């Protein structure tokens, strides 16, 4: 189950540059949000694989699921029914009960129970309290976030993460939609760390390079 959960599904040419950037800047980047312009662009898959690859390099990583509308980590890691991030934020459990060790270097915090998801909000002070505890235990926290164009929870997490990796689905996301979403994220205080153009068969377009620059 564990091996299947983090088996590579993202092209290595996409995964490796992102991993190199995280490792290079790990002294100042301890919490990374992974989000997308719209649903279905591979955010959860990328977040899982980044966390797994980082852990395989001998560094400790925790994968936190803040994508509460489409939770997937509990099933992927065999944690169905276990408490998670929403339970912690709602004050239903102690933080330690929501963190589940997968192996020596990788832990997972799934979304949590449906009842807690309905009650919890990401502007709660418990979010920062929990992530501060995470900073003490792990080298890196990767937060699986909602899409930018949806509920707004990615923007709500901006004060709590050091920056975002944004996934853009190649050949399915219109340029204007992507540009507007990126601008919205920056306006909300989100620091863009980079963009992953997923499922692409073409070079990265010039407008995206300009944004990255």
Segments from the language model and where they lie:
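P-loop/Walker-type NTP enzyme "switch/lid" segment
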Residues: 2-41, 56-139, 148, 159
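Conserved catalytic-core segment of NTP-binding enzymes
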Residues: 49, 119-213
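Rossmann-fold NAD(P)-dependent oxidoreductase module
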Residues: 53
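Hydrophobic positions on the alpha1 helix immediately C-terminal to the Walker A/P-loop
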Residues: 45-46
